[in-house]
């Protein structure tokens, strides 16, 4: 039973690490492309900024979903029920 709990915690940690890494890379690419496109066409900057904030919210949602799944695995572990 301790092996299942340990493996679940390690899996949840890896899930959170990759979600944070993916979100950070996504924000970096998003910010870079926004600055590049705003410098290329300054008249579209306000329109692009609105779209950038929408995509930034979706990027944050990916990390929050990963946190929710990790909390589910840690506190309401469905794999422990399979042992009994």
UniProtKB/Swiss-Prot annotation:
Q: Where's it found, cell-wise? A: Cell inner membrane
Span-the-membrane segments of this chain are: 9-29, 54-74
Site features described as Reversibly protonated during proton transport, chain residue numbers: 60
Which keywords does this Swiss-Prot/TrEMBL entry list? ATP synthesis, Cell inner membrane, Cell membrane, CF(0), Hydrogen ion transport, Ion transport, Lipid-binding, Membrane, Transmembrane, Transmembrane helix, Transport
Question: How the protein sits in the membrane?
Answer: Multi-pass membrane protein
The family line of this record is: Belongs to the ATPase C chain family.
Q: How does it assemble?
A: F-type ATPases have 2 components, F(1) - the catalytic core - and F(0) - the membrane proton channel. F(1) has five subunits: alpha(3), beta(3), gamma(1), delta(1), epsilon(1). F(0) has three main subunits: a(1), b(2) and c(10-14). The alpha and beta chains form an alternating ring which encloses part of the gamma chain. F(1) is attached to F(0) by a central stalk formed by the gamma and epsilon chains, while a peripheral stalk is formed by the delta and b chains.
Know the name of this protein?
Answer: ATP synthase subunit c
